[in-house]
Amino acid sequence: AFLTMQAGGRPVEIELSREETFAFTRVRHAIDFSLKTAVRPDGRLVARRYEAYSNQGGYASHGHSIAANASNAYRHLYQDEQVLDADTYTVYTNIASGGAMRGYGIPQVNFAMEAHMDDVARAIGMDPIDLRVKNCMRQGYVDPGTGITCYTSGLLGCLDQGKKYIGWDEKRKAYANQTGNVRRGVGMAMFSYKTGVYPISLETASARLVLNQDGTAQLQMGATEIGQGADTVFTQMAAETIGFRDEDIHIVSTQDTDVTPFDTGAYASRQTYVSGMALKKTAKVFRARILNYAQYMLKRAANT
Protein backbone atom coordinates (compact mmCIF):
# COMPACT_ATOMS: atom_id res chain seq x y z
CA ALA A 1 0.00 0.00 0.00
CA PHE A 2 2.85 2.39 0.83
CA LEU A 3 4.62 1.77 -2.48
CA THR A 4 1.35 2.10 -4.40
CA MET A 5 0.67 5.41 -2.69
CA GLN A 6 4.17 6.65 -3.49
CA ALA A 7 3.80 5.66 -7.13
CA GLY A 8 0.28 6.95 -7.62
CA GLY A 9 0.42 9.92 -5.29
CA ARG A 10 -2.95 9.21 -3.69
CA PRO A 11 -4.00 7.50 -0.42
CA VAL A 12 -4.50 3.74 -0.63
CA GLU A 13 -6.93 1.83 1.60
CA ILE A 14 -5.96 -1.50 3.16
CA GLU A 15 -8.98 -3.70 3.85
CA LEU A 16 -8.38 -6.92 5.80
CA SER A 17 -10.64 -9.94 5.75
CA ARG A 18 -12.11 -11.20 9.01
CA GLU A 19 -9.57 -14.03 9.08
CA GLU A 20 -6.67 -11.66 8.43
CA THR A 21 -7.88 -9.34 11.17
CA PHE A 22 -7.71 -12.07 13.80
CA ALA A 23 -4.53 -13.70 12.50
CA PHE A 24 -2.33 -10.70 11.74
CA THR A 25 -3.49 -7.86 13.98
CA ARG A 26 -3.64 -7.60 17.76
CA VAL A 27 -6.35 -9.18 19.92
CA ARG A 28 -7.43 -8.73 23.53
CA HIS A 29 -5.49 -10.77 26.09
CA ALA A 30 -7.14 -13.82 27.60
CA ILE A 31 -6.13 -13.92 31.28
CA ASP A 32 -6.60 -16.82 33.69
CA PHE A 33 -6.99 -15.79 37.33
CA SER A 34 -6.61 -17.66 40.60
CA LEU A 35 -8.06 -15.66 43.50
CA LYS A 36 -8.13 -16.38 47.23
CA THR A 37 -9.60 -14.21 49.97
CA ALA A 38 -9.48 -14.39 53.76
CA VAL A 39 -12.60 -12.80 55.23
CA ARG A 40 -13.96 -12.26 58.73
CA PRO A 41 -17.44 -13.52 59.72
CA ASP A 42 -18.79 -9.95 59.50
CA GLY A 43 -17.61 -9.68 55.88
CA ARG A 44 -14.48 -7.62 56.42
CA LEU A 45 -11.72 -8.55 53.96
CA VAL A 46 -8.53 -9.54 55.78
CA ALA A 47 -6.15 -10.51 52.97
CA ARG A 48 -6.29 -11.35 49.29
CA ARG A 49 -4.10 -13.51 47.07
CA TYR A 50 -4.00 -12.85 43.33
CA GLU A 51 -2.35 -14.89 40.58
CA ALA A 52 -2.79 -14.21 36.88
CA TYR A 53 -1.53 -15.80 33.67
CA SER A 54 -1.89 -13.57 30.61
CA ASN A 55 -1.92 -15.24 27.18
CA GLN A 56 0.34 -12.95 25.17
CA GLY A 57 0.47 -14.86 21.89
CA GLY A 58 3.62 -14.88 19.79
CA TYR A 59 5.00 -11.37 20.33
CA ALA A 60 5.44 -9.03 23.28
CA SER A 61 3.42 -6.00 22.16
CA HIS A 62 1.81 -4.60 25.35
CA GLY A 63 1.92 -7.88 27.25
CA HIS A 64 3.79 -7.10 30.45
CA SER A 65 2.25 -3.67 30.95
CA ILE A 66 -1.30 -4.97 30.51
CA ALA A 67 -0.69 -7.77 33.00
CA ALA A 68 0.77 -5.23 35.43
CA ASN A 69 -2.13 -2.84 34.91
CA ALA A 70 -4.61 -5.60 35.68
CA SER A 71 -2.91 -6.50 38.95
CA ASN A 72 -2.63 -2.83 39.88
CA ALA A 73 -6.38 -2.36 39.32
CA TYR A 74 -7.28 -5.39 41.43
CA ARG A 75 -6.51 -3.59 44.67
CA HIS A 76 -8.25 -0.30 43.89
CA LEU A 77 -11.91 -1.15 44.37
CA TYR A 78 -11.76 -2.88 47.76
CA GLN A 79 -9.73 -2.32 50.90
CA ASP A 80 -8.36 -5.17 52.97
CA GLU A 81 -6.38 -5.27 56.19
CA GLN A 82 -3.22 -6.64 54.58
CA VAL A 83 -1.34 -5.51 51.49
CA LEU A 84 -2.45 -7.46 48.41
CA ASP A 85 -0.24 -10.46 47.58
CA ALA A 86 -0.05 -10.69 43.79
CA ASP A 87 1.89 -12.57 41.11
CA THR A 88 1.33 -11.95 37.42
CA TYR A 89 2.83 -13.87 34.51
CA THR A 90 2.95 -13.21 30.78
CA VAL A 91 2.88 -16.46 28.79
CA TYR A 92 4.00 -16.65 25.16
CA THR A 93 1.95 -19.00 22.96
CA ASN A 94 1.52 -19.70 19.26
CA ILE A 95 -1.75 -17.80 18.78
CA ALA A 96 -2.44 -14.23 17.64
CA SER A 97 -0.57 -11.67 19.71
CA GLY A 98 -2.40 -9.68 22.35
CA GLY A 99 -2.24 -5.90 22.16
CA ALA A 100 -3.58 -2.69 23.65
CA MET A 101 -7.38 -2.90 23.69
CA ARG A 102 -9.90 -0.63 25.38
CA GLY A 103 -9.61 -1.09 29.14
CA TYR A 104 -6.02 -2.34 29.02
CA GLY A 105 -6.44 -5.47 31.16
CA ILE A 106 -8.91 -3.96 33.61
CA PRO A 107 -12.14 -5.46 32.15
CA GLN A 108 -10.63 -8.95 32.54
CA VAL A 109 -9.57 -8.46 36.15
CA ASN A 110 -12.82 -6.73 37.14
CA PHE A 111 -14.87 -9.62 35.79
CA ALA A 112 -12.81 -12.09 37.80
CA MET A 113 -12.85 -9.93 40.92
CA GLU A 114 -16.59 -9.32 40.92
CA ALA A 115 -17.40 -12.97 40.26
CA HIS A 116 -15.10 -13.82 43.16
CA MET A 117 -16.81 -11.30 45.46
CA ASP A 118 -20.14 -12.97 44.72
CA ASP A 119 -18.57 -16.32 45.64
CA VAL A 120 -17.29 -14.85 48.92
CA ALA A 121 -20.71 -13.39 49.74
CA ARG A 122 -22.38 -16.73 49.05
CA ALA A 123 -19.82 -18.62 51.17
CA ILE A 124 -20.42 -16.48 54.28
CA GLY A 125 -24.16 -16.04 53.70
CA MET A 126 -23.99 -12.29 53.15
CA ASP A 127 -25.84 -10.05 50.74
CA PRO A 128 -23.47 -9.22 47.82
CA ILE A 129 -24.20 -5.49 48.06
CA ASP A 130 -23.65 -5.45 51.83
CA LEU A 131 -20.29 -7.16 51.31
CA ARG A 132 -19.25 -4.51 48.82
CA VAL A 133 -20.48 -1.63 50.99
CA LYS A 134 -18.41 -2.91 53.90
CA ASN A 135 -15.19 -3.15 51.87
CA CYS A 136 -15.34 -0.71 48.96
CA MET A 137 -12.94 2.19 48.59
CA ARG A 138 -14.06 5.36 50.33
CA GLN A 139 -13.12 9.01 50.26
CA GLY A 140 -9.75 9.47 51.92
CA TYR A 141 -8.43 6.04 50.95
CA VAL A 142 -4.69 6.06 50.22
CA ASP A 143 -3.41 3.46 47.76
CA PRO A 144 -0.57 1.61 49.53
CA GLY A 145 1.24 0.98 46.26
CA THR A 146 1.18 4.44 44.69
CA GLY A 147 0.39 6.76 47.60
CA ILE A 148 -2.46 8.29 45.57
CA THR A 149 -5.37 9.57 47.68
CA CYS A 150 -9.04 9.16 46.76
CA TYR A 151 -10.38 12.68 47.30
CA THR A 152 -13.95 12.11 46.11
CA SER A 153 -16.14 9.02 45.83
CA GLY A 154 -19.83 8.61 45.09
CA LEU A 155 -19.65 4.83 45.17
CA LEU A 156 -21.70 4.28 48.34
CA GLY A 157 -24.46 6.55 47.08
CA CYS A 158 -24.43 4.77 43.73
CA LEU A 159 -24.85 1.39 45.42
CA ASP A 160 -27.68 2.71 47.58
CA GLN A 161 -29.58 4.21 44.65
CA GLY A 162 -28.97 1.20 42.42
CA LYS A 163 -30.27 -1.14 45.11
CA LYS A 164 -33.37 0.99 45.50
CA TYR A 165 -34.26 1.44 41.83
CA ILE A 166 -33.58 -2.14 40.79
CA GLY A 167 -35.77 -3.50 43.58
CA TRP A 168 -32.84 -5.56 44.82
CA ASP A 169 -34.29 -6.89 48.08
CA GLU A 170 -37.68 -7.71 46.59
CA LYS A 171 -36.23 -9.55 43.60
CA ARG A 172 -33.75 -11.55 45.66
CA LYS A 173 -36.59 -12.69 47.89
CA ALA A 174 -38.82 -13.53 44.92
CA TYR A 175 -36.11 -15.47 43.09
CA ALA A 176 -34.75 -17.34 46.13
CA ASN A 177 -36.56 -20.69 45.77
CA GLN A 178 -37.00 -21.42 42.10
CA THR A 179 -37.14 -24.77 40.33
CA GLY A 180 -37.09 -25.84 36.71
CA ASN A 181 -34.68 -25.33 33.86
CA VAL A 182 -35.48 -21.65 33.31
CA ARG A 183 -34.97 -19.35 36.29
CA ARG A 184 -34.64 -15.65 36.95
CA GLY A 185 -31.90 -13.96 38.90
CA VAL A 186 -30.70 -10.54 39.92
CA GLY A 187 -27.08 -9.49 40.18
CA MET A 188 -24.78 -6.53 40.33
CA ALA A 189 -21.12 -5.73 39.82
CA MET A 190 -18.83 -2.77 40.30
CA PHE A 191 -16.10 -1.54 37.99
CA SER A 192 -13.11 0.66 38.69
CA TYR A 193 -10.87 2.28 36.12
CA LYS A 194 -7.95 4.60 36.50
CA THR A 195 -6.72 7.37 34.23
CA GLY A 196 -3.21 7.58 32.85
CA VAL A 197 -0.32 5.15 33.13
CA TYR A 198 1.27 6.24 36.41
CA PRO A 199 3.01 4.55 38.28
CA ILE A 200 4.00 2.25 35.39
CA SER A 201 5.30 5.31 33.54
CA LEU A 202 5.41 9.08 34.00
CA GLU A 203 2.69 11.39 32.68
CA THR A 204 3.52 14.65 30.91
CA ALA A 205 1.18 17.28 29.49
CA SER A 206 1.29 20.97 28.59
CA ALA A 207 -0.90 23.69 27.07
CA ARG A 208 -0.56 27.13 25.48
CA LEU A 209 -3.11 29.99 25.46
CA VAL A 210 -2.73 33.00 23.16
CA LEU A 211 -4.87 36.13 23.62
CA ASN A 212 -6.27 37.41 20.34
CA GLN A 213 -6.85 41.10 19.56
CA ASP A 214 -10.63 40.61 19.55
CA GLY A 215 -10.62 39.34 23.15
CA THR A 216 -10.87 35.65 22.30
CA ALA A 217 -8.20 33.07 23.03
CA GLN A 218 -6.42 30.52 20.88
CA LEU A 219 -5.88 27.22 22.68
CA GLN A 220 -3.05 24.94 21.60
CA MET A 221 -2.97 21.39 22.94
CA GLY A 222 -0.69 18.53 22.01
CA ALA A 223 -3.34 16.13 23.33
CA THR A 224 -5.00 14.78 20.21
CA GLU A 225 -8.73 14.86 19.48
CA ILE A 226 -9.59 11.41 18.06
CA GLY A 227 -13.37 11.63 18.37
CA GLN A 228 -13.70 11.23 22.14
CA GLY A 229 -14.67 14.87 22.71
CA ALA A 230 -11.40 16.08 24.23
CA ASP A 231 -11.49 19.44 22.45
CA THR A 232 -14.96 20.13 23.82
CA VAL A 233 -13.80 19.38 27.35
CA PHE A 234 -10.66 21.49 26.92
CA THR A 235 -12.74 24.40 25.63
CA GLN A 236 -15.11 24.20 28.59
CA MET A 237 -12.28 23.92 31.13
CA ALA A 238 -10.42 26.89 29.67
CA ALA A 239 -13.55 29.06 29.45
CA GLU A 240 -14.64 28.29 33.01
CA THR A 241 -11.19 28.91 34.50
CA ILE A 242 -10.55 32.16 32.62
CA GLY A 243 -14.12 33.49 32.74
CA PHE A 244 -14.66 33.46 28.97
CA ARG A 245 -17.62 32.14 27.02
CA ASP A 246 -17.11 28.74 25.40
CA GLU A 247 -17.32 30.31 21.94
CA ASP A 248 -14.44 32.64 22.82
CA ILE A 249 -12.02 29.71 23.08
CA HIS A 250 -10.71 28.64 19.67
CA ILE A 251 -9.10 25.22 19.30
CA VAL A 252 -8.19 23.38 16.09
CA SER A 253 -8.86 19.63 16.24
CA THR A 254 -6.19 18.92 13.63
CA GLN A 255 -3.41 20.85 15.34
CA ASP A 256 0.16 20.28 14.21
CA THR A 257 1.93 18.67 17.16
CA ASP A 258 5.20 20.06 15.83
CA VAL A 259 3.86 23.49 16.86
CA THR A 260 1.80 22.73 19.96
CA PRO A 261 3.31 22.14 23.41
CA PHE A 262 4.35 18.54 24.05
CA ASP A 263 1.85 15.94 25.18
CA THR A 264 2.33 12.18 25.28
CA GLY A 265 -0.93 11.40 23.49
CA ALA A 266 -4.48 10.12 23.56
CA TYR A 267 -4.51 6.91 25.58
CA ALA A 268 -5.51 5.50 28.97
CA SER A 269 -8.46 7.89 29.40
CA ARG A 270 -5.91 10.48 30.48
CA GLN A 271 -6.75 13.64 28.59
CA THR A 272 -9.36 15.25 30.84
CA TYR A 273 -7.53 14.36 34.05
CA VAL A 274 -3.91 14.82 32.95
CA SER A 275 -3.91 17.17 29.95
CA GLY A 276 -6.90 19.01 31.37
CA MET A 277 -5.06 19.72 34.61
CA ALA A 278 -2.14 21.17 32.64
CA LEU A 279 -4.65 23.35 30.80
CA LYS A 280 -6.27 24.47 34.05
CA LYS A 281 -2.91 25.58 35.47
CA THR A 282 -2.13 27.41 32.23
CA ALA A 283 -5.55 29.10 32.23
CA LYS A 284 -5.04 30.36 35.78
CA VAL A 285 -1.74 31.99 34.79
CA PHE A 286 -3.38 33.36 31.63
CA ARG A 287 -6.21 34.93 33.64
CA ALA A 288 -3.83 36.40 36.21
CA ARG A 289 -1.74 38.07 33.51
CA ILE A 290 -4.82 39.61 31.90
CA LEU A 291 -6.01 40.98 35.24
CA ASN A 292 -2.57 42.29 36.15
CA TYR A 293 -2.34 44.15 32.86
CA ALA A 294 -5.89 45.46 33.29
CA GLN A 295 -4.94 46.84 36.70
CA TYR A 296 -1.95 48.60 35.14
CA MET A 297 -4.03 50.08 32.32
CA LEU A 298 -7.08 51.10 34.38
CA LYS A 299 -5.26 52.04 37.59
CA ARG A 300 -7.74 50.09 39.70
CA ALA A 301 -7.87 46.74 41.50
CA ALA A 302 -9.03 43.73 39.51
CA ASN A 303 -11.87 42.93 41.90
CA THR A 304 -13.52 46.35 41.67
Regions found by a protein language model. Give the residues of each.
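Structural alpha/beta core scaffold segments of enzyme domains
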Residues: A1-T304
